Amino acid sequence: MTQTNQAPLVIKLGGAALSCTQTLSQLFGAIAAYQKSAQRQIAIVHGGGYLVDELMAKLQLKTVKKHGLRVTPYDQIPVIAGALAGTANKLLQGQAIADGLNAVGLSLADGGLCHVEELDPELGAVGKATPGDSSLLQAILNTGALPIISSIGLTAEGQMMNVNADQAAVAVAGALDAELVLLSDVSGVLDGKGHLLKSLSKKEANALIEGQVITDGMIVKVKAALEAANDLGRPIEVATWRYPEKLTQLFAGESIGTQFLPQ
């Protein structure tokens, strides 16, 4: 792959997209076409909450969330890590390979990509990721491959941690000094009347959170996007994967969702 001066692009993929083969195929098709035309390095960071929920239900384990974050008891982290770093990662890698991409499956721990520490004792094995050493990831990107990174990390003591995938994507983008797009089930952030907000500042976002217009998991996403915009010093986009025909425009920098602006 020819190198350009364009910053790498990190795409966070989550929600129901992971359960729809056709959607994933269209998404990877758009990534392959854009990667080829723009000669740009791309990495994917993914969650897989629905897989975890399915597995927890099968094992008759209770799912508890606090402020939009999954409570992960330490005795459950092997199950959750297996679902995210194992099943979800390989499902995505397999689909990318089927669509002609050279995909490499990774986690936040590989090559010291992200430092991870316990976020809150009440949440259990839930980690906060910060940018680490991106040299291994950069070496993989330099081969033209597509890294697909799960949001499972390791602490300095080797403890497995579940990291919210939006927050993990922010840390990976920080490590790479990359642009970031957060793809989800929704078209962006909606106001109280259900209309798409084209841009959002921290002050506006906080008002919508206080007014309970932004709730649950969207609070985590919005906070991650605001944090990323400030840390990276560039706008961050929250958009939907539901319109694959618009993704090439999105990857090229055109806004199709809600942009979060650095303060």
Curated annotation (Swiss-Prot):
Signal peptide location: none
Gene Ontology molecular function terms on file: acetylglutamate kinase activity; ATP binding
CDD domains documented for this protein: AAK_NAGK-NC
Catalysed reaction equations from the record: N-acetyl-L-glutamate + ATP = N-acetyl-L-glutamyl 5-phosphate + ADP
Major localisation: cytoplasm
Assigned GO CC terms: cytoplasm
Name of the molecule in the record: Acetylglutamate kinase
Organism: Vibrio parahaemolyticus serotype O3:K6 (strain RIMD 2210633)
